[in-house]
Amino acid sequence: MTIMSNLNIPLFPDQEKDLSSSASQPETAPIGAEILIEQLHKFYGQIKVLEDLDLHIQAGEFIAIVGRSGCGKSTLLRLIAGLEHTSYGEIKFKSARHFREGITSDDIRVMFQDPRLLPWKSILHNVQLGLNKQQLPIAEQLLEKVGLKDKAGQWPSQLSGGQRQRTALARALSHSPRILLLDEPLGALDALTRLEMQSLIERLWKEQGFTAILVTHDVSEAVQLADRIILLDKGHIAQSFEVNLPRPRHKSLEFAQLEQQVLEAVLAT
């Protein structure tokens, strides 16, 4: 599914196209994109949603954004995706793979709480959307990675909620995006399925090296997945928490302490 068209988002200002440099990059280099957000503002009429926001995200980093409802989390994600325009300020991208003049729709993919599968297409055909003939085998490979190889010929209505989100994840990764945006994709799932999806997302993130940004109301989920947790409050970054816990993460005293620290910070906003 193409989420954007005709994007022309600038790279870092000191960055120049260097084909000889990009050619020397190893094929195994991370595909994630570095993101630099500077003095970002977003208004809807007279209502300020994001104000003077600065954020630097490293290539391949996993960021979680938390905060109360209405603090600007999903708005920030839509601005990064190019689904909305900034009021002013800049969002710049730099590829860890090679330099490029801008960023395309295939470079950024979004997963929502609603998987948005086409009901008249099979699971395999949903994942194949937007792929050319040479790329079609990628869809089958991804369905195998997410544990749905045996469901390829079924319809979305035949799948559970967790299986539909696994399909959406496979579809999002079919174009090898540099950035994966996760807008509360696990919010409607039961607890066990949610844990399974967290593990799957983490495994594919580690395998593929994309930059991941997760919006969530679940502080435990943020601690489970993120390298860094950003707390938004009234359109500003209120706090930032480094998550220096080994992966894969398990419940521990350190995990619980950080979870409580972040939760108390959210409740204090």
Curated annotation (Swiss-Prot):
Gene Ontology cellular-component annotations: plasma membrane
Location in the cell reads: Cell inner membrane
Where does this chain mainly localize? Answer: membrane
* EC code(s) of this entry: 7.6.2.14
By its UniProt entry, which SUPFAM superfamilies does this protein fall under? P-loop containing nucleoside triphosphate hydrolases (SSF52540)
Taxonomy, superkingdom? Bacteria
Membrane topology type, per the record? Peripheral membrane protein
- Taking every annotated instance into account, which residue ranges of this chain make up the domain ABC transporter? 35-259
Family annotation (InterPro entries): AAA+_ATPase (IPR003593), ABC_transporter-like_ATP-bd (IPR003439), ABC_transporter_ATP-bind (IPR050166), P-loop_NTPase (IPR027417)
The record's keywords, sorted A to Z, are: ATP-binding, Cell inner membrane, Cell membrane, Membrane, Nucleotide-binding, Translocase, Transport
Enumerate the GO terms in the molecular function aspect: ATP binding; ATP hydrolysis activity
The record lists the catalysed reaction(s) as: ATP + H2O + aliphatic sulfonate-[sulfonate-binding protein]Side 1 = ADP + phosphate + aliphatic sulfonateSide 2 + [sulfonate-binding protein]Side 1
Q: Which top EC class is named for this enzyme in its record?
A: translocase
The positions annotated for binding ATP are: G67, R68, S69, G70, C71, G72, K73, S74
User: Is ATP-binding a UniProt keyword of this protein?
Assistant: yes
Q: Which PROSITE patterns match?
A: ABC_TRANSPORTER_2, SSUB
Pfam families associated with the record: ABC_tran
Describe the task this protein carries out: Part of the ABC transporter complex SsuABC involved in aliphatic sulfonates import. Responsible for energy coupling to the transport system.
**Assembly mode:** The complex is composed of two ATP-binding proteins (SsuB), two transmembrane proteins (SsuC) and a solute-binding protein (SsuA).
- Which family does the UniProt entry place this protein in? Belongs to the ABC transporter superfamily. Aliphatic sulfonates importer (TC 3.A.1.17.2) family.
User: What is this protein identified as?
Assistant: Aliphatic sulfonates import ATP-binding protein SsuB
Species of origin reads Acinetobacter baylyi (strain ATCC 33305 / BD413 / ADP1)
